[in-house]
Curated annotation (Swiss-Prot):
The lineage of its organism: Eukaryota, Metazoa, Chordata, Craniata, Vertebrata. One of its GO terms (molecular function) is protein-containing complex binding. Interacts (via C-terminal part) with SYT1 and SYT2; interaction with synaptotagmins making a link with the SNARE molecules. Interacts with SLC9A7. This is Secretory carrier-associated membrane protein 5. It is a multi-pass membrane protein. The keyword Transport applies.
């Protein structure tokens, strides 16, 4: 088997850093989980873009007469939350769907609930916290309408991220409970060390892939397009 080379994040060649993770949805994730895993990845991307737009909104806030603290914190949130959210909640759910690991699911639930709370706080927008939420934006309309309109864009985006995060958490929890997952299974994986054993993880991944392929390749009853009628010669 060829060695997997880290390919994420895809950094430009002029940056003297190498990718830290290997990510290949089609190769790692079973087909039945592929769609949900990609949606969570897109949610992470949306959250990252929202943090970047929030930086622009805080710059408009600063230009319009707001304090420099918000702009500084917005920059900090961008460089801090973008990689941390990927490592802390997306990688666990990626690994959970890849290896069917209850421990990884629990790690995702714990960190993603924190992400949901943060998203709600960002959407609310407490002044001085470095986010253009509803309170900060609405209150700034009386000071500078132009800046407030720019601030309204990340405010709406933070709200969308919060709503999508709640939906995503509900979908993953519904799947996990429906598949028979539980906290006791996560404790068992932690006790036995199965959550960090590469051989156990590979076996679980192969089993999941095999089950998915078996379901897809299951023969189905073929029916003729031409009806066949049988007549009796008895009167």
């Amino acid at each position: 088997m060829a060695e997997k080379v880290n390919n994420f994040p895809p950094l430009p060649k002029f940056i003297p850093l190498k990718p830290c993770f290997y990510q290949d949805f089609e190769a790692d994730i079973p087909p039945q989980h592929l769609s949900l895993t990609k949606r969570l990845y897109y949610l992470w991307m949306l959250n990252s873009v929202t943090l970047a737009v929030n930086l622009v909104g805080c710059l408009a806030w600063l230009i319009g007469g707001g304090g420099a603290t918000n702009f500084g914190l917005a920059f900090l949130w961008l460089i801090l939350f973008t990689p941390c959210s990927y490592v802390c909640w997306f990688r666990p759910i990626y690994k959970a769907f890849k290896t069917d690991s209850s421990f990884s699911f629990m790690a995702f639930f714990f960190t993603f609930m924190a992400q949901l709370v943060i998203s709600i706080i960002q959407a609310v927008g407490i002044p001085g916290w470095g986010v253009c939420g509803w309170i900060a934006t609405i209150s700034f309309f009386g000071t500078n309408i132009g800046s407030a309109v720019v601030m309204l864009i990340p405010t709406v985006m933070f709200t969308v991220v919060a709503v999508f995060s709640f939906i995503a958490l509900s979908m993953v929890h519904k799947f996990y409970r429906g598949s028979g997952g539980s906290f006791s299974k996560a404790q068992e994986e932690w006790t036995t060390g199965a959550w960090k054993n590469p051989h156990v993880q590979q076996a679980a991944q192969n089993a999941a892939m095999g089950a998915a392929q078996g379901a897809m390749n299951q023969p189905q009853t073929q029916y003729s397009a031409t009806p066949n009628y049988t007549y009796s010669n008895e009167m």
